[in-house]
Amino acid sequence: KKIVSYSYPFNRSNQYTYFQPNFDQLNVSDFFLFRCDNFDTVFIAENNLAIFTSDPVECKHVFYFFSISGSNCGRFEVNSDSFHYQLKIDSEMTGGETIGGFIHQTEYSSEFLEKIPGIDSKQLIFQHRGYTGFRRKESSSSCFSFLHGNFGGMYIRKGKLLSISRQRSEHYYTPQIIIKIDKFYELFFLNPTSKMLIISIILVDKYNKSRTIGNSKISPFGSYKFELNTFSKSEIENISWKTNLPVGRAIVFENNGVLFDVFHT
């Protein structure tokens, strides 16, 4: 006997829609966070075709930067034939913006693509899920804390920013972390969609009582920083947020006044 019936709405999911580009070299990028405030930011950009062919390939890396309000605030490009290119992001690249998001795009010469057998440039899709590293400014350490890209699906077409990301039904997103005492948290939310995104942040105590501690509207392609100080707290709590993003992850910086950690939720 069938135990699960399709008549129940919670057994259904949104229908998958295949996206086929009609132009050459589609680049689908995650939405990455940059910080030029009291942190240094580096980005490890992949040269997809060099990795695919196991040989150095000349690649143009193009980076587009967006402010907290979602406006285009900077563009930087560089040519490299290395398998990976490390970019150190500074405020000159970001138009003076200290916090925001960015995407990564690549371009290859059509002459090179024609030499690779079996490749149709109109069916060639590059996915950029590179790694972003963070380190406190003027740190004596040469090490960065890295994490991969956040939910994106963004690309540039004829100079215009577009996205295949869509907002879905409102739901609660509960990460696998706890809010500890004696910490300072910075939660960064990025909106990879072309619509205004509403976020409500909720804390849940050990008695399972919840309270809303923050609400924000994030502009299309914008970002939002939420701060939470637990130095005066006496108990551990859980955190959730209400969102319309299918994958509503935040980027979290956890500080104790001396050390910090950065991770996805």
Region locations from a protein language model:
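Gly/Pro-rich, tryptophan- and cysteine-flecked surface segments typical
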Residues: 1-265
